[in-house]
Amino acid sequence: MYDYIIVGSGLFGAVCANELKKLNKKVLVIEKRNHIGGNAYTEDCEGIQIHKYGAHIFHTNDKYIWDYVNDLVEFNRFTNSPLAIYKDKLFNLPFNMNTFHQMWGVKDPQEAQNIINAQKKKYGDKVPENLEEQAISLVGEDLYQALIKGYTEKQWGRSAKELPAFIIKRIPVRFTFDNNYFSDRYQGIPVGGYTKLIEKMLEGVDVKLGIDFLKDKDSLASKAHRIIYTGPIDQYFDYRFGALEYRSLKFETERHEFPNFQGNAVINFTDANVPYTRIIEHKHFDYVETKHTVVTKEYPLEWKVGDEPYYPVNDNKNMELFKKYRELASREDKVIFGGRLAEYKYYDMHQVISAALYQVKNIMSTD
């Protein structure tokens, strides 16, 4: 008999397992896939660590979280400085003085601010009602049309006028010549990949791969006092109220027998007529000298039940539906729901680690 069965070996599940192990709890981790790590999983390709489910870059201002992961594995000093290509022209991201110079030829911050102020004037002082209005209020019409509109509409599969304004609030805008996408104090990627980090968390914990918990829920649940479930909350309840919506992704990975494909880890392709949103060249995340390179093209997809869920569509309709599932979950005495799928929430990696640590602390206070 286990004290806890944890369903899912992504970051939330792995952190919970690591913490419960320290408390001498008997833990079993069940994973539906044939590998650990969830979407943070990395796979070695002759020295290059492949981010199998899209780019994952760790960043945080929280020293406790940074120390937590660095106590487990070594991190490199990777800095995320993506580029964007629009009509064959390169732009720096995030939006900063380099971007403004590339778009308008300006050299000082006041010039750039004046152009943005003039371009957003048509909206006056009204609060932005959708993503398009929010984006123009941040960077003006020109940069919105070139670098945001096509990319975002590909990513979400709908008009920017139909998307909520809050989505674009995550995008940094700076009036300095600073290409570092994140402003966090700590940033990097585990040397040797994220799988090493998850392996370290799961050391000394029983792990079973290739097992779908929901296909044998009652039998498996009987083997533990409590369950920590990190899968989709709607699927747990058999889609009783209908499916929560997501966006999905398709990845096309190519190996090339030359050492350098694009010279940068991430390049966004913002033209609406280019079907993929970005190309990732994996070796630049944790640079290694090789005679080959591996790149991945990322294509956004409509999601349907059975597809891999990536980005929750947190509009009003879906959030109302989620509240119904959350109410059902609150009645499950034996089951604790946590992580991005169980909470129908977009998490950065440092946030999901923090949430898992808090969850274990909460469990221990009520156990």
Curated annotation (Swiss-Prot):
Q: What is this protein called?
A: UDP-galactopyranose mutase
Q: Which residues bind UDP-alpha-D-galactose?
A: 12, 80, 152, 156, 181, 268, 278, 311, 346
Q: Which source organism does the UniProt entry give?
A: Escherichia coli (strain K12)
Q: How does it assemble?
A: Homodimer.
Which family does the entry's similarity section mention? Belongs to the UDP-galactopyranose/dTDP-fucopyranose mutase family.
Q: Outcome of mutating residue 151 to F, per the record?
A: 3-fold decrease in the mutase activity
Cofactor dependency: FAD
Q: Which InterPro entries match?
A: UDP-GALP_mutase, UDP-GalPyranose_mutase_C
EC number(s) for this protein?
A: 5.4.99.9
Keyword annotations for this protein, in alphabetical order, are: FAD, Flavoprotein, Isomerase, Lipopolysaccharide biosynthesis
How, per the record, is the cofactor bound? Answer: Binds 1 FAD per subunit.
Q: Which GO terms describe its cellular component?
A: cytosol
Class of enzymatic activity (EC top level): isomerase
The consequence of residue 156 to A is: Loss of mutase activity
Q: What biological-process terms (Gene Ontology) are attached? A: lipopolysaccharide biosynthetic process
Q: What is the effect of changing residue 156 to Y?
A: 2-fold decrease in the mutase activity
Q: Which domain of life is it from?
A: Bacteria
Pathway involvement of the protein, from the record: Bacterial outer membrane biogenesis; lipopolysaccharide biosynthesis
Spell out the PANTHER family in the cross-references.
Answer: UDP-GALACTOPYRANOSE MUTASE
Cite the GO molecular-function annotations of the record. flavin adenine dinucleotide binding; protein homodimerization activity; UDP-galactopyranose mutase activity
